[in-house]
């Protein structure tokens, strides 16, 4: 067994990050890799396609029931899923109460201290990326995750979140070993999406690892709480995830310290691609619409 690789999938909520990560990890386990998934998203949906179940009980929830995290055994919080993948969910507090990142910190420390990281080739963190607050940045900040893969699309907010996550990586890159592995574009069928993803990757100084095409088979598999790899292993989408897994596997040690851009540069890039209008164009369009309404 080689050196443990600690990777993380970051991305804005609703981008398909958990789906992408679970399908990729299912493909990695087919390649003979031993994997532990640590879900760090308050939705706690980072393992359901691997376990083929409803949401897994979280470390925080189980700790609250048991009295404290010290009262738990690893077997209580780690479940075994597809082809032996180990799964755990950190969890978070009730909405509006406390810091969701606290669960991430508690869970990772508990898992490490109790041997959950032994005998695996990969630990994969699935992390919410709209907010790179202290808690959610914890896998980066505490030098746990070494390679970050940002799941994004051609939509403006996904690009904005990707750039923000790159800023978070840059902040901790010099003090720790964290690097940006690259971007994964989840197709949303927006205009010039692949070009835009490649342009952002170039600005950030990283690779566009893979462009995952949109395919309804993903939703069909999700309804059965399965990855595409398990649901329809011979379909073209399963091959896309295998290709993505291969690229990540071969990307070891090739991460970069990113070069995030300013909001102005991001808006300029969107204007160049015709995604966003300039202030003058916008005002002109509003004036034309108002004139048409009066006519």
Curated annotation (Swiss-Prot):
Q: Which InterPro entries match?
A: NifH/chlL_CS (IPR030655), NifH/frxC (IPR000392), Nitrogenase_Fe_NifH (IPR005977), P-loop_NTPase (IPR027417)
* Modification sites for ADP-ribosylarginine: 102
Q: Which domain of life is it from?
A: Bacteria
Matching PROSITE patterns, A to Z? NIFH_FRXC_1 (PS00746), NIFH_FRXC_2 (PS00692), NIFH_FRXC_3 (PS51026)
Q: What class of enzyme is it?
A: oxidoreductase
Keywords from the named record: 4Fe-4S, ADP-ribosylation, ATP-binding, Iron, Iron-sulfur, Metal-binding, Nitrogen fixation, Nucleotide-binding, Oxidoreductase
Q: What is its EC number?
A: 1.18.6.1
Q: Which residues bind [4Fe-4S] cluster?
A: 99, 133
Note on cofactor: Binds 1 [4Fe-4S] cluster per dimer.
Give one Pfam family, short name only. Fer4_NifH
Q: How is it modified after translation?
A: The reversible ADP-ribosylation of Arg-102 inactivates the nitrogenase reductase and regulates nitrogenase activity.
Q: Name one GO molecular function term.
A: metal ion binding
Name the catalysed reactions.
Answer: N2 + 8 reduced [2Fe-2S]-[ferredoxin] + 16 ATP + 16 H2O = H2 + 8 oxidized [2Fe-2S]-[ferredoxin] + 2 NH4(+) + 16 ADP + 16 phosphate + 6 H(+)
The residues that the entry says bind ATP are 11-18
Record carries keyword Membrane: no
What cofactor does this protein call for?
Answer: [4Fe-4S] cluster
Which biological process, per GO, is one annotated for this protein? nitrogen fixation
Q: Which protein family is it in?
A: Belongs to the NifH/BchL/ChlL family.
Job of this protein: The key enzymatic reactions in nitrogen fixation are catalyzed by the nitrogenase complex, which has 2 components: the iron protein and the molybdenum-iron protein.
Under the subunit heading, UniProt states: Homodimer.
What protein am I looking at? Answer: Nitrogenase iron protein 1
Origin organism lineage: Bacteria, Pseudomonadati, Pseudomonadota, Alphaproteobacteria, Rhodobacterales
């Amino acid at each position: 067994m080689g050196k443990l690789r600690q990777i993380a999938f970051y991305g804005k909520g609703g981008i398909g990050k958990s789906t992408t990560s679970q399908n990729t990890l299912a493909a990695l386990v087919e390649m003979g890799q031993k994997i532990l998934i640590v879900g760090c998203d308050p939705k706690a949906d980072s393992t359901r396609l691997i376990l083929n179940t409803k949401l897994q009980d979280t470390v925080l929830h189980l700790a609250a029931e048991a009295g404290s995290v010290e009262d738990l055994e690893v077997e209580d919080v780690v479940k075994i899923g597809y082809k032996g993948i180990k799964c755990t969910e950190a969890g978070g507090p009730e909405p509006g109460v406390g810091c969701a990142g606290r669960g991430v910190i508690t869970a990772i420390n508990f898992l490490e201290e109790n041997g959950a990281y032994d005998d695996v080739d990969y630990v994969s963190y699935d992390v919410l990326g709209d907010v790179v607050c202290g808690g959610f940045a914890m896998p980066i900040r505490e030098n746990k995750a070494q390679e970050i893969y940002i799941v994004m699309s051609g939509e403006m907010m996904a690009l904005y979140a990707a750039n923000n996550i790159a800023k978070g990586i840059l902040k901790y890159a010099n003090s720790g070993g964290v690097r940006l592995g690259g971007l994964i574009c989840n197709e949303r069928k927006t205009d010039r999406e692949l070009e835009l993803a490649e342009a952002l990757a170039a600005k950030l100084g990283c690779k566009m690892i893979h462009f995952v095409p949109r395919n309804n088979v993903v939703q069909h598999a999700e309804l059965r709480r399965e990855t595409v790899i398990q649901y329809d292993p011979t379909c073209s989408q399963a091959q896309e995830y295998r290709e993505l897994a291969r690229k990540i596997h071969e990307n070891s040690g090739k991460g970069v310290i990113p070069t995030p851009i300013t909001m102005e540069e991001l808006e300029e890039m969107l204007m160049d691609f015709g995604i966003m209008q300039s202030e003058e164009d916008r005002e002109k369009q509003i004036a034309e619409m108002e004139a048409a309404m009066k006519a």
